[in-house]
Amino acid sequence: MSAYEYPRLSRSDIITALKDAQIASVTETDLKTPTSDFVSELYTRILIYLDALDEEEKGQVDFEALEQLENPDHHATSMQAMKLYCKVKDMLEMLDCPLPISFKDLLRPESSRTEFFISALLNYGLYKDSKMDLIRPKAEELGLLDEQRKQCEAKVAQLNAEIGEFDEAVERDLPFVQELEANIEQLNKKILELNNQQMSLRATFQKMREKSTQMDNEISKAEFDLVETVQENANLRSQIVQSPDKLQGALEEKKLVLGETKKAEQSAMVTFQEKAAILEVFEKALKKILKSSSQLQLINEQVTNAKTVEKEFKALKDKLSEDGVAYKSLEAKVVERERIVEQLNESLKQLEKEKAVMFDDWTKQLNELKVEVESRRRELETRQTNVESVVAMVDDNTAKTNQVRQSGEAKVKKLAAKYEEIVKQFHEYTVSFDAFLPSL
């Protein structure tokens, strides 16, 4: 027995179940006195509801099997009925239905047996719907996870593309960066040298400024001494008349002092000009240093931009690693859902194998039934031949005596009735036999 049971539903329950499932709209009269057409249509709709029969297969017949018959047009309806019977029988056998169905249940259905078979199929449908309701959230969740996996894969692909572009940009700019780093190193060395030179020049400039200040003081002092000398010279001129000899000596002494003062003044002027030239050189060097400093500032800005790009690249790598972790967790969930789907597929394959085994058993029984029908058909042919010979004998004996004729006519009528019954049975067996041929 399967996981579900076969409680016989009442007619009202069957009507309600068929209506709720939108299979068919039936009445109690239809179930109380079922007809062959009603039962065939109801079984067809139930099989379509259970996915055991496609909507397109409804009313179709096996034309290849019909071509093997002498009059295929006479067997189209019987072929459809036999095909439906095989489908219903396979389904009930798959459900381990305790009550076997026969072809008679389609041709001349009984109310109790029909209700039992419909109850079994509807119970299976309810059982299947309940299981599908349990599986449906998992399937929807699996679909959402698959969609999220696709989105993550697209996002990872986009990030990989961006990383590839960044890697290409890094490789493309690597020679320039290396050259820039070399230039920066050279400029740093040059800046260090210029800073040292600037410190040295500042110290020298400070010394020269102090020396210039000292020379200015000396020049001022020399000018002051010159003024005093001029005043003394004027005094000496006024005193020449009074003491020329003494004045001449003092004058010569003053001339010597004045000569030394002029020499000191000339020397101070030369030193001042040299200091001015050195100061001009310092100013030019300072301008060059300022220009180099501006270039260095631009280079530092480029280096800062390169470092910013590198930080962004590292941030993208970290983000990619986080997305990779999320993707791995999502992939683990997808693997788990795929494992569940594989288990369901394995269960479905097992059911299909069991169905194939049942179908083989049914085919074997059908072959045996075919042999039996063939033997009965031959027996009926023999009987028909015998009947024809008897009729001929009766016709011959009719001319002899009226009594024999009357008894012969009665016997012929009796044999004719029996013959019609035999022909009718023969026709039913022929229809059944022809209906089994497509599945061979």
From Swiss-Prot:
Keywords associated with the record: Cell cycle, Cell division, Centromere, Chromosome, Coiled coil, Mitosis
InterPro entries referenced in this protein's UniProt entry, alphabetically: Kinetochore_Nuf2_N (IPR005549), Nuf2_N_sf (IPR038275)
Primary subcellular site in the record, as a coarse category: nucleus
Localization per Swiss-Prot or TrEMBL: Chromosome, Centromere
Residues annotated as transmembrane: none
Biological process per Gene Ontology, one example term: mitotic sister chromatid segregation
Family: Belongs to the NUF2 family.
Quaternary structure (record): Component of the NDC80 complex, which consists of NDC80, NUF2, SPC24 and SPC25.
This protein's name: Kinetochore protein NUF2 homolog
Organism: Arabidopsis thaliana (Mouse-ear cress)
Name of the gene: NUF2
